[in-house]
Each structure stands twice: as C-alpha cells, then as structure tokens.
Amino acid sequence: PKVKRTDNEIAKFKIMTPAQLVKKGSDFLKKNKIKTHQIDSELILSGLIGKSREDLLISLDFELNKSLITSFNSSISRRGVKREPIAYILNKKEFWSLNFKVHPGILIPRPETELMVEKIVKYYKNDNPYILDIGTGSGCIIISLLKELKNSKGVAIDISKVALKIAKKNSIINNTANRIKFINSSVLKINNFK
C-alpha cells in the first residue's frame, strides 16, 4: 500500500539549506516507496536551482529562499504522491548529451533510443542522409542525428501540435532549427516530404 502525504504535510519542511531540503525530500519519497528517492530529491533541487546535480552536491551549505522551498515541496509531492516522472516535473531531459524540453503527453527520451542514434550515426558518418522522423515528439532523435551528421537535413512529422511546438523549441536550443522542416500531420496524409 502506498503512503500518501499531502502538500500541507510536505509544506511543514522548515528548511534553509540544500542539504536539509534534499534529506527531507528523500525521506518523503522513501516513505512513498520511490526507489530512487535520494537521486530524485537531488535532481529536483538541482533542476530548480539551475545547477548540475554534481555542483549542488559540492555546495550544499548555502541558504534557500521560501519561494524555492515551496517549489521544491510541490515538485516532491508530484513525484511522491502523483508518481510523475522527474522529466515532466522539471520539463527537461538529457539525451545524447543534449538538453531537451519535455512535456506531459510527449514521450520522455529513453536511454535505449540513444543506441539507435549511435548506430545511425556510425552507419552514415561519411554521408549526408535526408532524415525523416515520424512521430518526432520532443525531436530528440532528429536533433541528435543532425548534431552528429553536420551536413544533413530532415523532416520532423507529428500529429500533435504541442509536440511540434516543443520539438521546434528544442531545435532552436540545440542549433538545428535551420536544418529541420516541421510538419503537423498524420504521416498517412503526406505525399511529399520535401
């Protein structure tokens, strides 16, 4: 049986340092049967502060403001009670050593997909293929391929306008926007991809 805690219970954290906040967040997640409680607490706080997890762990003794503590408590509750993935809570996910925005309703990039990107890059490393990404979602596949295959271009198709909006933002963040044509459509309705 899951242990449920309310936002009010989490809000009673009266904490001033990152070390204390990470500990309380980790304890809360552990009580709610989150196996990755420690790393999740660290990732949430580092994401909210805007530092890498490593940088956060090096400097755990500075004071936090109430606004950040409130955001942390809300995020920990989303993870522990609602079971939301960290990527959706932070609205970002690293893939192929690149940063991608993600959003509920768009699949979170998975490490296994990096194996596919790796094989495609290895196979086409001396070519300039025209890439077609059907169901692009966050755009992580086509953007990662274009970062490696410097002279390639491609088309990203998705039926979801929300997904395409996120994919376009990701292409701008990762400097590939000028090499991708985005199409909002079902692949079954498209005749010409160029």
Region annotations inferred by a language model:
Residues 11, 16, 70-71, 77, ...:
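Residues marking helix boundaries in flexible regions
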